[in-house]
Amino acid sequence: MLTRPREIYLATAVSIGILLSLIAPLGPPLARADGTSQLAELVDAAAERLEVADPVAAFKWRAQLPIEDSGRVEQQLAKLGEDARSQHIDPDYVTRVFDDQIRATEAIEYSRFSDWKLNPASAPPEPPDLSASRSAIDSLNNRMLSQIWSHWSLLSAPSCAAQLDRAKRDIVRSRHLDSLYQRALTTATQSYCQALPPA
């Protein structure tokens, strides 16, 4: 019995659908259904962590403390490396990402110190205690690490750079980041797309 054209069409459509369903998982989509980057939450957490630089700088200025605290940095990076290892994420990648984040944060603090050196009256008179800011930083570190784990495959995919650029544009717009924060965000995220492909 001859196959009718409609049956041929349906069979072909089904075959194409199956083929596409097999191909689709091979690469992450460039954006979610709402048009936002899949890296938006990670980049937003990085931006929020950068914003903690302002109250930290204000406290250090009033307390006459140095901006850089190598002991605290080493402690943070060691813990993050251990946490990454426990989640089967490359610890070298994680420590590199957070080292970038810390250097970007310190750059903002140095900028604030420079402003207040020129105009001491512009410094916040009663900054929040440093412990509150550090608690916020620890929480944001965990949030960022969770996002890295969730998007590990994407961070090593060819589409990572495009997703990262989209996420940065969206976060700059939504958080109204000025030029200083935009440069800091670029530094903080510069190693995101250097993850090794999953074994």
Curated annotation (Swiss-Prot):
SMART domains assigned: CM_2
Enzyme Commission numbers on file: 5.4.99.5
Listed SUPFAM superfamilies: Chorismate mutase II
Keyword Membrane included in the entry's annotation: no
Highest taxon listed in the record's lineage: Bacteria
GO annotations of cellular component type: extracellular region
Transmembrane segments: none
Consequence of changing residue 72 to A: Less than 1% of the wild-type enzyme activity
Pathway the protein contributes to: Metabolic intermediate biosynthesis; prephenate biosynthesis; prephenate from chorismate: step 1/1
Cysteine-cysteine disulfides: 160-193
UniProt entry tagged with the keyword S-adenosyl-L-methionine: no
Reactions listed under catalytic activity: chorismate = prephenate
Example of a GO MF term: chorismate mutase activity
Keyword set, alphabetical order: Disulfide bond, Isomerase, Secreted, Signal
Cell location: Secreted
InterPro entries per UniProt: Chorismate_II_sf (IPR036263), Chorismate_mutase-related (IPR051331), Chorismate_mutase_periplasmic (IPR008240), CM_dom_sf (IPR036979), CM_II_prokaryot (IPR002701)
Domain Chorismate mutase: 34-113
PROSITE patterns named in the record: CHORISMATE_MUT_2 (PS51168)
Top-tier EC class: isomerase
pH dependence: Optimum pH is 7.5. The activity is dramatically affected under alkaline conditions (pH 9.5).
Regulation: Tyrosine, phenylalanine, and tryptophan moderately enhance chorismate mutase activity at low concentrations, but allosterically inhibit the enzyme at higher concentrations.
Gene Ontology biological-process entries: chorismate metabolic process; salicylic acid biosynthetic process
NCBIfam families tied to this protein: CM_mono2 (TIGR01806), PRK09269.1 (NF006741)
Further facts: Was identified as a high-confidence drug target. In the presence of high concentrations of tyrosine, phenylalanine, and tryptophan, the enzyme is completely protected from proteolytic degradation.
Quaternary organization: Homodimer.
Name of the protein in its database record: Secreted chorismate mutase
